[in-house]
Amino acid sequence: MSSELNIPVDPSTPAVSERGNKGMDYRDWVRRSYLELVTSNHHSVQALSWRKLYLSRAKLKASSRTSALLSGFAMVAMVEVQLEMKYGYPQLLLIAFSACTTVLVAVHLFALLISTCILPNVEAVSNIHNLNSVNESPHDRMHPYIELAWGFSTALGILLFLAEVVLLCWIKFLPIDSALTRNETATTQKPRGNAGWNSALVSTIIMVPVGIIFVIFTIHFYRTLVRHKTERHHQEIEELHKLKVQLDGHDRGINVV
Protein backbone atom coordinates (compact mmCIF):
# COMPACT_ATOMS: atom_id res chain seq x y z
CA MET A 1 0.00 0.00 0.00
CA SER A 2 2.78 2.30 0.89
CA SER A 3 4.51 1.36 -2.33
CA GLU A 4 1.37 2.33 -4.25
CA LEU A 5 1.15 5.65 -2.42
CA ASN A 6 4.80 6.43 -2.95
CA ILE A 7 4.65 6.34 -6.70
CA PRO A 8 7.73 7.99 -8.15
CA VAL A 9 6.81 11.05 -10.08
CA ASP A 10 8.83 12.22 -13.04
CA PRO A 11 10.54 15.44 -11.90
CA SER A 12 10.49 16.84 -15.41
CA THR A 13 6.66 16.91 -15.57
CA PRO A 14 6.01 19.95 -13.34
CA ALA A 15 8.97 21.73 -14.87
CA VAL A 16 7.52 21.23 -18.33
CA SER A 17 4.08 22.39 -17.27
CA GLU A 18 5.57 25.33 -15.41
CA ARG A 19 7.71 26.18 -18.44
CA GLY A 20 4.62 25.97 -20.63
CA ASN A 21 2.76 28.35 -18.35
CA LYS A 22 5.72 30.68 -18.37
CA GLY A 23 5.88 30.41 -22.15
CA MET A 24 2.24 31.39 -22.50
CA ASP A 25 2.69 34.29 -20.09
CA TYR A 26 5.78 35.37 -21.96
CA ARG A 27 3.94 35.31 -25.29
CA ASP A 28 1.13 37.35 -23.81
CA TRP A 29 3.63 39.82 -22.44
CA VAL A 30 5.37 40.16 -25.82
CA ARG A 31 2.02 40.58 -27.58
CA ARG A 32 0.90 43.19 -25.07
CA SER A 33 4.26 45.00 -25.36
CA TYR A 34 3.95 44.99 -29.13
CA LEU A 35 0.47 46.50 -28.98
CA GLU A 36 1.68 49.15 -26.56
CA LEU A 37 4.62 49.89 -28.85
CA VAL A 38 2.34 50.28 -31.87
CA THR A 39 0.02 52.53 -29.89
CA SER A 40 2.89 54.65 -28.61
CA ASN A 41 4.33 54.94 -32.12
CA HIS A 42 0.93 56.08 -33.39
CA HIS A 43 0.74 58.74 -30.69
CA SER A 44 4.35 59.73 -31.40
CA VAL A 45 3.52 60.27 -35.07
CA GLN A 46 0.48 62.33 -34.09
CA ALA A 47 2.56 64.38 -31.66
CA LEU A 48 5.20 64.99 -34.34
CA SER A 49 2.52 66.12 -36.79
CA TRP A 50 1.05 68.52 -34.23
CA ARG A 51 4.52 69.86 -33.46
CA LYS A 52 5.08 70.57 -37.16
CA LEU A 53 1.70 72.28 -37.34
CA TYR A 54 2.43 74.57 -34.38
CA LEU A 55 5.89 75.33 -35.74
CA SER A 56 4.45 76.24 -39.14
CA ARG A 57 1.84 78.44 -37.49
CA ALA A 58 4.48 80.24 -35.42
CA LYS A 59 6.64 80.83 -38.51
CA LEU A 60 3.71 82.21 -40.47
CA LYS A 61 2.74 84.56 -37.65
CA ALA A 62 6.29 85.84 -37.21
CA SER A 63 6.70 86.23 -40.96
CA SER A 64 3.47 88.19 -41.35
CA ARG A 65 4.26 90.55 -38.48
CA THR A 66 7.84 91.18 -39.55
CA SER A 67 6.92 91.67 -43.20
CA ALA A 68 4.09 94.06 -42.40
CA LEU A 69 6.33 96.15 -40.15
CA LEU A 70 9.36 96.38 -42.44
CA SER A 71 7.42 96.88 -45.66
CA GLY A 72 5.41 99.65 -44.02
CA PHE A 73 8.60 101.32 -42.84
CA ALA A 74 10.11 101.14 -46.33
CA MET A 75 7.01 102.68 -47.89
CA VAL A 76 6.92 105.49 -45.32
CA ALA A 77 10.65 106.13 -45.76
CA MET A 78 10.31 106.41 -49.53
CA VAL A 79 7.30 108.72 -49.29
CA GLU A 80 8.53 110.92 -46.46
CA VAL A 81 12.12 111.34 -47.60
CA GLN A 82 12.75 114.91 -48.74
CA LEU A 83 15.26 115.31 -51.52
CA GLU A 84 17.16 118.57 -51.85
CA MET A 85 16.34 119.88 -55.30
CA LYS A 86 19.35 122.20 -55.29
CA TYR A 87 21.78 119.36 -54.57
CA GLY A 88 23.09 117.08 -57.28
CA TYR A 89 22.73 113.55 -55.89
CA PRO A 90 24.89 110.84 -57.42
CA GLN A 91 22.88 108.93 -59.96
CA LEU A 92 23.95 105.53 -58.60
CA LEU A 93 22.79 106.51 -55.11
CA LEU A 94 19.27 107.36 -56.29
CA ILE A 95 19.07 104.21 -58.41
CA ALA A 96 20.28 102.05 -55.52
CA PHE A 97 17.78 103.62 -53.11
CA SER A 98 14.88 103.17 -55.51
CA ALA A 99 15.82 99.56 -56.34
CA CYS A 100 16.44 98.60 -52.70
CA THR A 101 13.13 100.07 -51.56
CA THR A 102 11.19 98.37 -54.35
CA VAL A 103 12.79 94.96 -53.79
CA LEU A 104 12.35 95.30 -50.02
CA VAL A 105 8.64 96.03 -50.33
CA ALA A 106 8.15 93.29 -52.94
CA VAL A 107 9.92 90.64 -50.85
CA HIS A 108 8.00 91.45 -47.69
CA LEU A 109 4.67 91.69 -49.49
CA PHE A 110 5.30 88.29 -51.08
CA ALA A 111 6.04 86.80 -47.66
CA LEU A 112 2.96 88.53 -46.28
CA LEU A 113 0.86 87.13 -49.12
CA ILE A 114 1.98 83.56 -48.37
CA SER A 115 1.34 84.00 -44.66
CA THR A 116 -2.09 85.52 -45.23
CA CYS A 117 -3.16 82.69 -47.54
CA ILE A 118 -1.90 79.74 -45.49
CA LEU A 119 -2.24 80.94 -41.89
CA PRO A 120 -6.09 80.90 -41.70
CA ASN A 121 -6.21 77.25 -42.80
CA VAL A 122 -3.58 76.26 -40.24
CA GLU A 123 -5.30 78.27 -37.50
CA ALA A 124 -8.65 76.61 -38.24
CA VAL A 125 -7.18 73.13 -37.76
CA SER A 126 -5.08 74.02 -34.71
CA ASN A 127 -8.19 75.21 -32.85
CA ILE A 128 -9.89 71.81 -33.23
CA HIS A 129 -9.25 69.60 -30.19
CA ASN A 130 -8.95 66.34 -32.06
CA LEU A 131 -5.78 64.35 -32.65
CA ASN A 132 -6.82 63.16 -36.11
CA SER A 133 -7.69 66.66 -37.34
CA VAL A 134 -4.00 67.40 -37.93
CA ASN A 135 -4.24 65.52 -41.23
CA GLU A 136 -6.63 68.20 -42.52
CA SER A 137 -4.02 70.95 -42.20
CA PRO A 138 -2.15 71.95 -45.39
CA HIS A 139 1.11 72.70 -43.55
CA ASP A 140 2.85 69.56 -44.87
CA ARG A 141 1.89 70.23 -48.48
CA MET A 142 2.70 73.94 -48.16
CA HIS A 143 5.94 73.42 -46.25
CA PRO A 144 8.21 74.81 -49.05
CA TYR A 145 6.12 77.97 -49.28
CA ILE A 146 6.17 78.42 -45.51
CA GLU A 147 9.95 78.12 -45.45
CA LEU A 148 10.18 80.52 -48.40
CA ALA A 149 8.08 83.12 -46.60
CA TRP A 150 10.13 82.60 -43.43
CA GLY A 151 13.40 83.08 -45.30
CA PHE A 152 12.20 86.12 -47.21
CA SER A 153 10.86 87.79 -44.09
CA THR A 154 13.75 87.10 -41.72
CA ALA A 155 16.94 86.63 -43.74
CA LEU A 156 16.63 88.45 -47.06
CA GLY A 157 14.15 91.03 -45.80
CA ILE A 158 16.30 92.13 -42.87
CA LEU A 159 19.42 92.38 -45.04
CA LEU A 160 17.55 94.62 -47.46
CA PHE A 161 16.29 96.65 -44.52
CA LEU A 162 19.86 97.25 -43.31
CA ALA A 163 20.85 98.35 -46.80
CA GLU A 164 17.82 100.65 -46.85
CA VAL A 165 18.96 102.34 -43.63
CA VAL A 166 22.44 102.95 -45.06
CA LEU A 167 21.07 104.45 -48.28
CA LEU A 168 18.72 106.68 -46.30
CA CYS A 169 21.65 107.99 -44.28
CA TRP A 170 23.54 108.89 -47.45
CA ILE A 171 20.52 110.63 -48.96
CA LYS A 172 19.76 112.61 -45.81
CA PHE A 173 23.31 113.62 -44.86
CA LEU A 174 24.99 114.33 -48.20
CA PRO A 175 23.12 117.63 -48.89
CA ILE A 176 24.38 119.03 -45.57
CA ASP A 177 27.75 119.85 -47.15
CA SER A 178 26.23 122.08 -49.81
CA ALA A 179 23.98 123.79 -47.25
CA LEU A 180 26.96 124.52 -45.01
CA THR A 181 28.88 125.90 -47.98
CA ARG A 182 26.09 128.35 -48.79
CA ASN A 183 25.77 129.42 -45.15
CA GLU A 184 29.50 129.99 -44.76
CA THR A 185 29.63 132.81 -47.33
CA ALA A 186 28.86 135.47 -44.72
CA THR A 187 31.58 134.26 -42.32
CA THR A 188 35.34 134.43 -42.44
CA GLN A 189 35.86 130.76 -41.56
CA LYS A 190 36.84 128.29 -44.21
CA PRO A 191 33.96 125.98 -45.04
CA ARG A 192 34.63 122.40 -44.14
CA GLY A 193 32.10 120.67 -46.36
CA ASN A 194 32.71 117.21 -44.82
CA ALA A 195 30.01 116.93 -42.15
CA GLY A 196 27.42 115.16 -44.29
CA TRP A 197 29.96 112.87 -45.92
CA ASN A 198 31.46 111.88 -42.57
CA SER A 199 28.03 111.24 -41.04
CA ALA A 200 26.99 108.97 -43.89
CA LEU A 201 30.36 107.23 -43.82
CA VAL A 202 30.07 106.56 -40.08
CA SER A 203 26.63 105.02 -40.53
CA THR A 204 28.02 102.79 -43.28
CA ILE A 205 31.02 101.76 -41.17
CA ILE A 206 28.70 100.82 -38.31
CA MET A 207 26.19 98.98 -40.48
CA VAL A 208 28.68 96.84 -42.41
CA PRO A 209 29.87 94.89 -39.33
CA VAL A 210 26.26 94.59 -38.20
CA GLY A 211 25.36 93.03 -41.54
CA ILE A 212 28.33 90.65 -41.37
CA ILE A 213 27.40 89.63 -37.83
CA PHE A 214 23.82 89.09 -38.95
CA VAL A 215 24.92 86.80 -41.80
CA ILE A 216 27.27 84.85 -39.52
CA PHE A 217 24.55 84.46 -36.89
CA THR A 218 22.06 83.31 -39.50
CA ILE A 219 24.44 80.65 -40.84
CA HIS A 220 25.40 79.55 -37.32
CA PHE A 221 21.77 79.36 -36.24
CA TYR A 222 20.85 77.30 -39.29
CA ARG A 223 23.77 74.92 -38.81
CA THR A 224 22.94 74.52 -35.11
CA LEU A 225 19.31 73.80 -35.92
CA VAL A 226 20.25 71.24 -38.56
CA ARG A 227 22.74 69.61 -36.18
CA HIS A 228 20.07 69.40 -33.48
CA LYS A 229 17.60 67.76 -35.86
CA THR A 230 20.27 65.33 -37.05
CA GLU A 231 21.15 64.33 -33.49
CA ARG A 232 17.48 63.81 -32.69
CA HIS A 233 17.07 61.59 -35.76
CA HIS A 234 20.15 59.57 -34.78
CA GLN A 235 18.75 59.08 -31.28
CA GLU A 236 15.42 57.92 -32.66
CA ILE A 237 17.18 55.50 -35.02
CA GLU A 238 19.24 54.10 -32.13
CA GLU A 239 16.11 53.67 -30.03
CA LEU A 240 14.37 51.86 -32.87
CA HIS A 241 17.43 49.64 -33.33
CA LYS A 242 17.40 48.77 -29.62
CA LEU A 243 13.70 47.93 -29.79
CA LYS A 244 14.35 45.75 -32.83
CA VAL A 245 17.13 43.89 -31.02
CA GLN A 246 14.92 43.37 -27.97
CA LEU A 247 12.00 42.12 -30.06
CA ASP A 248 14.30 39.78 -31.99
CA GLY A 249 15.60 38.42 -28.69
CA HIS A 250 12.05 37.92 -27.43
CA ASP A 251 11.06 36.12 -30.62
CA ARG A 252 14.05 33.80 -30.26
CA GLY A 253 13.05 33.10 -26.67
CA ILE A 254 9.52 32.26 -27.76
CA ASN A 255 10.80 29.93 -30.47
CA VAL A 256 13.04 28.16 -27.96
CA VAL A 257 10.12 27.74 -25.58
UniProtKB/Swiss-Prot annotation:
**KW Metal-binding (keyword) present:** no
Record-level GO BP terms: store-operated calcium entry
Query: How is it placed in the membrane, per its record?
Result: Multi-pass membrane protein
Alphabetical keyword list: Membrane, Transmembrane, Transmembrane helix
Q: Which Gene Ontology MF annotations are present?
A: store-operated calcium channel activity
Top-level taxon of origin: Eukaryota
Which Gene3D superfamilies is this protein grouped with?
A: Calcium release-activated calcium channel protein Orai
Disulfide cross-links: none
Gene Ontology cellular-component terms for this entry are: membrane
Q: Where is the major localization of this protein?
A: membrane
Any idea what job this protein has? Answer: Ca(2+) release-activated Ca(2+)-like (CRAC-like) channel subunit which mediates Ca(2+) influx and increase in Ca(2+)-selective current by synergy with the Ca(2+) sensor, stim1.
Q: Which family does it belong to?
A: Belongs to the Orai family.
What name has this protein been given in UniProt?
Answer: Protein orai-2
Gene behind this protein: orai2
